[in-house]
């Protein structure tokens, strides 16, 4: 049956026309054959990094359930105390380390905790105008960038997740909704923040930079709908935390409308009351690189007579294993970012889909 006569129809949107055509043909070929597709979330299903934007939102709104002592513990947890690499200096050219940064962050957090987090002595607007908040914000972002630049991806991810400790899973989902709604409405692009020039502390004056904002990709949401409509199951495997992706991928206000049981992301352990603790739940593989393939092998393939995914979508090296390791995969959909997955673009199975950096929209070229 030709695509012209088929019931498979992807919205034209901003797809590269050839990519859209080949995706339609793939869906037509595998419709109602007990097949499935797997996708990354951040910068693949959406524009932007959901976990990063939650981290930004927590700082901007001081949404923490940690007392100062526990906060001080988690921001240092498992982080080596040796100096960072050459590129991670303060504005005076001094190379920094976790001890100097954490000491300053902890001192600022005590003030923020006593005056806003635990007791609203100041309004959010007032607390944001304090030197303590300015110093806290910039040094948190500096440290957040320094960790993956100096240590393992696992350490950096867990450090970020541990800032959610003390919240219930439902509280995290509510926070995820608030953060996602807010960041969908903000400009996308890099933001630079500088620490206090008055409260310089042990780390001195630093600048932090972060990539702010999120965008929905309607073409990807439509692809998921069309796959499902034709009997092809859709799975998400993400390196963000589970509760966050569950909200974005399944809440109908965002339009992806995926099944919650098909979401596999990072998971912390929790108490009997569903309060998250600062320990990873290794009953599930760590969903980066090889761990993404392990999720498919352990939890997904057995449902499909040990068949691999027919289609895999990703954008970065963390997705490379699941993009390349399954012989049944006919299309690798790469949502192209500069300098990412260049080693795969000559694979005959690859469809490269570009994006507009200024708008976050797909680029049909």
Language-model-detected regions and their locations in the chain:
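Non-catalytic pre-domain segments flanking phosphatase-related domains
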Residues: 1-41, 47-100, 105, 113, ...
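C-terminal cap/substrate-recognition subdomain and adjoining C-terminal extension
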Residues: 2-36, 131, 150-151, 167-365
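Phenylalanine-focused residue identity feature
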Residues: 39, 55, 71, 84, ...
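Phosphate-/polyanion-interacting regions in eukaryotic proteins
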Residues: 45, 50-57, 107-214
């Amino acid at each position: 049956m030709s695509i012209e006569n088929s019931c498979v129809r992807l919205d034209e949107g901003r797809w590269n026309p050839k990519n859209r055509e080949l995706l339609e043909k793939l869906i037509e070929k595998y419709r109602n054959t007990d097949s499935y597709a797997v996708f990354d979330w951040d910068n693949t299903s959406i524009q932007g990094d959901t976990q990063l934007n939650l981290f930004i939102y927590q700082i901007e709104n001081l949404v923490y359930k940690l007392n100062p002592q526990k906060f001080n513990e988690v921001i240092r947890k498992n982080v080596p105390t040796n100096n960072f690499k050459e590129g991670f200096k303060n504005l005076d050219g001094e190379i920094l380390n976790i001890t100097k940064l954490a000491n300053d962050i902890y001192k600022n957090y005590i003030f923020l905790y006593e005056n806003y987090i635990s007791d609203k002595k100041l309004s959010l607007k007032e607390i944001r105008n304090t030197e303590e908040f300015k110093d806290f914000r910039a040094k948190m972002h500096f440290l957040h960038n320094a960790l993956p630049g100096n240590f393992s991806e696992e350490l950096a991810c867990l450090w970020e997740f541990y800032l959610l400790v003390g919240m219930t899973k439902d509280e995290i989902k509510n926070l995820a909704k608030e953060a996602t709604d807010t960041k969908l409405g903000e400009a996308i692009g890099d933001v630079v923040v500088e620490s206090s020039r008055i409260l310089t502390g042990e780390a001195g004056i630093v600048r932090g930079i972060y990539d702010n904002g999120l965008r929905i990709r309607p073409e990807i949401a439509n692809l998921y709908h069309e796959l499902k409509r034709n009997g092809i199951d859709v799975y998400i495997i993400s390196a963000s935390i589970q509760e966050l992706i569950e909200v974005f991928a399944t809440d109908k206000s965002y339009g992806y409308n995926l099944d919650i049981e098909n979401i596999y992301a990072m998971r912390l352990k929790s108490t009997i009351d569903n309060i998250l603790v600062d320990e990873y739940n290794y009953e599930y593989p760590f969903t980066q690189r090889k761990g993404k393939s392990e999720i498919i092998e352990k939890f997904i393939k057995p449902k499909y007579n040990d068949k691999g995914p027919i289609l895999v979508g990703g954008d970065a090296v963390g997705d490379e294993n699941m993009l390349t390791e399954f012989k049944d995969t006919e299309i690798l959909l790469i949502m192209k970012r500069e300098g990412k997955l260049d080693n795969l673009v000559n694979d005959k199975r690859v469809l490269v889909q570009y994006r507009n950096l200024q708008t976050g929209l797909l680029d049909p070229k």
